């Protein structure tokens, strides 16, 4: 299964820019399936501390199992691990100011979320229109699709999906209601806005992205984390951010640039790092990944 062969995106670059030091304190804001966290833990040693966040209860349980297996493997070399089943925007309340040697945030949706049809993130397999990273909290994508007005839907799809044909898509969704599954929504969107020859993505990709971002308030979460990051890092501490679409990357780019201009950060990546051909062949999801890094002055 995907969860068993999960390989974190840009792993070696992330570890290199984090500059993981034995005995240090590092935070993984997006634990996911613990790929990055496991690599960090291997380098920390018994005097180190790893703090990790994830609001997805299912991912947290799987990550705990992976970290337990790593603890059995490393024995006395395993660092202290502190896990928080909550949104990473709450890091300010859970991490001591100036205590981190490094903070990693990988904003991509995990393979677990994409590959499990019942989570409703993907049109690749039919499932209920849910899309919540924490299935216990907030509106589902189905509620948004079926309850929002046409203009509200169009604006949402345009803003968070950067979809130029948002009005046409919103009109088709309203006419097709009720829309309850991922496959049904994908069919409605594809019929309203067929794929253009110049595009390599599925015609429903941007609409699904927009709904997911809205349902999980993803951009607000990212902004909150990047705003508090300088307070959590000690002098010389590293911030490493991996984004997967232009909206995320724009927020990261602006935060690091502003931090550099204000003398808070030394920006370590003039241009974002991207995955090489070998990695993208192994993991096609890495194609859109961009890594940016900075060091607190």
From Swiss-Prot:
GO molecular function: rRNA (cytosine-N4-)-methyltransferase activity
EC number, UniProt record: 2.1.1.199
Residues reported in the UniProt entry to bind S-adenosyl-L-methionine: 34-36, 54, 88, 106, 113
Cellular-component GO terms for this entry: cytoplasm
GO BP: rRNA base methylation
HAMAP family xref list: 16SrRNA_methyltr_H
Reaction it catalyzes: cytidine(1402) in 16S rRNA + S-adenosyl-L-methionine = N(4)-methylcytidine(1402) in 16S rRNA + S-adenosyl-L-homocysteine + H(+)
Function: Specifically methylates the N4 position of cytidine in position 1402 (C1402) of 16S rRNA.
Superkingdom, natural source: Bacteria
Region annotation (Disordered) ranges: 272-297
Compartments (UniProt record): Cytoplasm
Keyword NAD in annotation: no
Predominant location category: cytoplasm
UniProt keyword Cytoplasm, yes or no: yes
Protein name, UniProt field: Ribosomal RNA small subunit methyltransferase H
Keywords carried by this UniProt record: Cytoplasm, Methyltransferase, rRNA processing, S-adenosyl-L-methionine, Transferase
Family: Belongs to the methyltransferase superfamily. RsmH family.
């Amino acid at each position: 299964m995907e969860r068993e062969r999960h390989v974190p995106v840009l792993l070696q670059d992330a570890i290199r820019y984090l500059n993981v030091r034995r005995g240090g304190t590092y935070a993984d804001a997006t634990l996911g399936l613990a790929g990055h966290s496991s690599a960090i833990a291997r380098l920390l040693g018994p005097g180190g501390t790893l703090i990790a966040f994830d609001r997805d209860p299912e991912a947290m349980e799987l990550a705990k199992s992976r970290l337990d297996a790593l603890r059995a493997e490393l024995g006395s070399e395993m660092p202290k691990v502190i896990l928080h089943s909550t949104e990473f925007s709450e890091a300010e309340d859970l991490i001591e100011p100036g205590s981190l040697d490094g903070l990693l945030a990988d904003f991509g949706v995990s393979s677990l979320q994409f590959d499990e049809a019942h989570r409703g993130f993907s049109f690749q397999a039919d499932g209920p229109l849910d899309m919540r990273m924490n299935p216990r909290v907030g509106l589902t994508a189905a509620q948004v699709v079926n309850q929002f007005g046409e203009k509200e839907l169009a604006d949402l799809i345009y803003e968070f999906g950067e979809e130029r044909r948002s009005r046409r898509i919103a009109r088709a969704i309203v006419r097709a209601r009720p829309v309850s599954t991922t496959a049904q929504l994908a069919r409605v969107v594809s019929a309203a806005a067929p794929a253009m020859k110049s595009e390599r993505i599925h015609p429903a990709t941007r609409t699904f992205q927009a709904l997911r971002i809205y349902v999980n308030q993803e951009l607000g979460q990212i902004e909150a984390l990047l705003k508090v990051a300088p307070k959590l890092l000690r002098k010389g501490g590293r911030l490493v951010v991996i984004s997967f679409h232009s909206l995320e990357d724009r927020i990261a780019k602006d935060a690091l640039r502003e931090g550099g201009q204000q003398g808070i950060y030394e920006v370590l990546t003039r241009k974002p790092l991207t995955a090489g051909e070998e990695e993208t062949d192994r993991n096609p999801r890495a194609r859109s990944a961009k890594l940016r890094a900075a060091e607190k002055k």
